[in-house]
């Protein structure tokens, strides 16, 4: 039996809270209500179920009357929460860089920080580039801070990350970024990992979502503009290492490309559905360059649509 599909885009925040009864901020509640029909995109596919899993998601299904045996165990959810933390991505990229040993790869400055000390100011001063700081669990630009100085504002933000979530990720901020893209996967029950395809998207400086291109894989690879053989090597690495993880479901690994052609191979790992996978499903269903209204027209709220091949979430206010 497939679970009813639900669009719970607040799931990353629910993972941070780690409670069964979680209520997201009112604006996010409105977004989830306005965009509820977006779940129709994946309800009859292998992705049927929630956008993302957490204790709060499990409780929501219980309240819908779903039998306990159809829901994941609390132990599985605890492991998913660990995997979904950006702390896990820090360890993952460290191993990736050590194994692949390719000068085209970035990410060596990415690290996990669980305390602040007087030497941090010195660490800032020896670099001539800004940093981006991210809390362990957040989405679409929330829980993100970009700074080039260890000033009072930055210290306050970082102390907030430490107090609320126990740490943060520190990485170089790539001002010369020219492209956001991702590799999308599905991990099966037998540990076999399917490569679903590439996705190309646009995000703001602080990571807020803009749009995804709904195009063929050939068009997306051309947009990415990286040696296909190198992409295949990177994809094979991810498939192999995802097969070792105690998880079943969709995975998206976000990356970026800089102006000189270097690649950050793992900005973060999303162990849930994402807009890139939706873009793949929509291309399969409607083709490239399509225009579709995915949720009801909303003159005073959120709506999801594809406009001339760009999948986006729009907010309108009268």
Residues of each region from the PLM?
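ATP-dependent carboxylate/phosphate-activation module, predominantly the ATP-grasp catalytic core
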Residues: 185-237, 270-295
